[in-house]
UniProtKB/Swiss-Prot annotation:
SUPFAM superfamilies: Ribonuclease PH domain 2-like, Ribosomal protein S5 domain 2-like. One of its GO terms (biological process) is rRNA catabolic process. It comes from Mycobacteroides abscessus (strain ATCC 19977 / DSM 44196 / CCUG 20993 / CIP 104536 / JCM 13569 / NCTC 13031 / TMC 1543 / L948). InterPro entries: ExoRNase_PH_dom1, ExoRNase_PH_dom2, ExoRNase_PH_dom2_sf, PNPase/RNase_PH_dom_sf, Ribosomal_Su5_D2-typ_SF, RNase_PH, RNase_PH_bac-type, RNase_PH_CS. Belongs to the RNase PH family. CDD domains: RNase_PH_bact (cd11362). This is Ribonuclease PH. The lineage of its organism: Bacteria, Bacillati, Actinomycetota, Actinomycetes, Mycobacteriales. Phosphorolytic 3'-5' exoribonuclease that plays an important role in tRNA 3'-end maturation. Removes nucleotide residues following the 3'-CCA terminus of tRNAs; can also add nucleotides to the ends of RNA molecules by using nucleoside diphosphates as substrates, but this may not be physiologically important. Probably plays a role in initiation of 16S rRNA degradation (leading to ribosome degradation) during starvation. The keyword Nucleotidyltransferase applies.
Length: 258
């Protein structure tokens, strides 16, 4: 197995760090780092649901993704200044929301919403997969917070862990967790969202300028699942530590939002 420019093996993740309690106001707040890619992920509970959801008795989980102006080498204007949200931003926001809704029982929230915000502080490839992986940890902390305050119908609404990783074919080799230098010249580029129960949530794959074989797809998926398993271990280790904020000593069960 060959070494990459950054010294990693083909199947090796960049150094991954998960810091809980990164900010103090949200119920869940995480800084996740995949090498030089750094994303702040927060989870906040808000009362009410979208109009189309009212009367269902079900909660909702939504997500927003954004890149800070100086998160890349060349500064870009905020989308709020441009007056519209770009297609890429909308796509990634929806991906994060879909990924996390796959693991939560929304009926436990009542008609209330968990809002996930993912802000890229520094980008070096794999920002959407880092966002999903970090957002799951923020969501888990938000669930702990809400359960401790007696605001959930079910104190354990999460059915599985969620993590995501980029994989691709670079220089003819299947590699995981691509930095920008590899992502920008990959022959095949793919993002995979997986659960710790062995199932997949989403697979996004593209041949960049050429087609690729079914056997290559299988190799990419195998590599992604193997890398995701490593991320699940890191998530579990991070969440094994005490909740980083203040929880009540003796919560009283009551309806969320009351």
């Amino acid at each position: 197995m060959s070494r990459r420019e950054d010294g990693r093996q083909d199947d090796e993740l960049r150094p991954v760090t998960i810091t809980r309690g990164f900010t103090s106001h949200p119920a869940g707040s995480v800084l996740i780092e995949f090498g030089q890619t750094r994303v702040m992920c927060t989870a906040s509970a808000t009362e009410g649901v979208p109009r189309w959801r009212k009367g269902s008795g079900l909660g909702w989980l939504t997500a927003e993704y954004a890149m800070l102006p100086a998160s890349t080498h060349t500064r870009s204007d905020r989308e709020s200044v441009k007056g519209r949200v770009g297609g890429r931003t909308q796509e990634i926001s929806r991906l994060i929301g879909r990924s996390l809704r796959a693991c939560i029982d929304l009926s436990a929230l009542g008609e209330n919403t968990i809002a996930i915000d993912c802000d890229v502080l520094q980008a070096d490839g794999g920002t959407r997969t880092a966002a999903i992986t970090g957002a799951y940890v923020a969501l888990a902390d938000a669930v702990t917070y809400l359960a401790a305050h007696g605001k959930l119908a079910d104190d354990e609404p999460l059915s599985c862990a969620i993590a995501a990783v980029s994989v691709g074919v670079v220089d003819g080799r299947v590699r995981v967790d691509l930095p920008y230098e590899e992502d920008s010249r990959a022959e095949v580029d793919m993002n995979v969202v997986a659960t710790d129960t062995g199932t997949l949530v989403e697979v996004q794959g593209t041949g960049e300028g050429a087609t690729f074989a079914r056997s290559t797809l299988d190799k990419l998926l195998d590599a992604a699942v193997g890398a995701a398993d490593q991320l699940f271990v890191l998530q579990k280790e991070a969440l094994a530590l005490p909740y980083p904020g203040v929880l009540p000593d003796a919560p009283q069960k009551k309806a969320f939002g009351s």
